[in-house]
Amino acid sequence: MVPQAHGLLLLCFLLQLQGPLGTAVFITQEEAHGVLHRQRRANSLLEELWPGSLERECNEEQCSFEEAREIFKSPERTKQFWIVYSDGDQCASNPCQNGGTCQDHLKSYVCFCLLDFEGRNCEKSKNEQLICANENGDCDQYCRDHVGTKRTCSCHEDYTLQPDEVSCKPKVEYPCGRIPVVEKRNSSSRQGRIVGGNVCPKGECPWQAVLKINGLLLCGAVLLDARWIVTAAHCFDNIRYWGNITVVMGEHDFSEKDGDEQVRRVTQVIMPDKYIRGKINHDIALLRLHRPVTFTDYVVPLCLPEKSFSENTLARIRFSRVSGWGQLLDRGATALELMSIEVPRLMTQDCLEHAKHSSNTPKITENMFCAGYMDGTKDACKGDSGGPHATHYHGTWYLTGVVSWGEGCAAIGHIGVYTRVSQYIDWLVRHMDSKLQVGVFRLPLL
């Protein structure tokens, strides 16, 4: 009897486990997913308890970023691994040349080059790229190429080459080509575009000189040194007695004296022996002052550049500054305040083409260049002759031209012609060191 009771109880228990009659044999998709989903991959319950294995988690099977982070612990190491794991190693082909080191990035790479190389793949030699024809060799001022070695930089005598071997720092209180009043207020000099131009604020054209005869305006000029100025040779074409000529530095407004002016007499006038009166070829003159001027915030020389620097670098700069007190309009009144204008330099071919179609334009030679606006809105004018055409480069201004000739003030379709100073740099330097006495001299260019 007892065994039968036990069997009956067992049967009831099994029926209870099966559930009520009519229960469905299959479960829903959501329930099945809940049963089958595994939070972590492992071959056994014990493996879930083991520390993460790179071989097991990511090499044998595809792993997620979260799983990789559990393995590496460090976010930085995880990121480095994941870039290669998910995208492939962009450095595998060794793209960096000349000993460069490759760093893999997502779908890209970066090469860290050795000191003498540059470029995306370190393919460019700096010694080959750093030549004076390429952006002046990155030099602040003067650049010189050397066969077999990289270029070297140097500076004007008023400056010192810095340890970086490219920068030039002033070594005197008033170096040439700098504008003290602008630097002291730490602002940019106005870049206005003498006809249609702007007043040059006091002190912002500190190299501007003015030649006067018997107290009247004769020509403009430019200070190169404490004792020397440059102007146009044609300014003396009709002067019988040059002893009446004075030079004024620090002048700004003809209608008033403010105490910053310095007046000097002229003791020497030196012209090229090939200059012919009434012609404009070789239109340049060097004047010696009877005693040096004193450099101040309002009297500073303009830098006379090296010839190669002027021809290869400065000549490529489109806009330069011209200044003077010339007539504001053709046959009009002379300006009382110093005026300045930014003029574009014209291509030599355009200049020659213009001269070909103009009966008034002189024959353009290699000793000249043209600048100005063909619409006639802005131009140098009579009275500006001899004034500076100054070009700015890396914080310093240089003398690139001397105002020589123009067809009236801002005549439509006409341009200004300037003496190309680079043709006379050697001549100027040579005679600034001369021991000539008082007088007018015509000296050979060679």
From Swiss-Prot:
Biological process annotations from GO: animal organ regeneration; blood coagulation; circadian rhythm; positive regulation of blood coagulation; positive regulation of leukocyte chemotaxis; positive regulation of platelet-derived growth factor receptor signaling pathway; positive regulation of positive chemotaxis; positive regulation of TOR signaling
GO molecular function: calcium ion binding; serine-type endopeptidase activity; signaling receptor binding
Covalent S-S links between cysteines: 58-63, 91-102, 96-111, 113-122, 132-143, 139-153, 155-168, 176-303, 200-205, 219-235, 351-370, 381-409
Domain EGF-like: 87-123, 128-169
Glycosylation sites: 93, 186, 244
Catalytic reactions of this protein: Selective cleavage of Arg-|-Ile bond in factor X to form factor Xa
Protein name: Coagulation factor VII
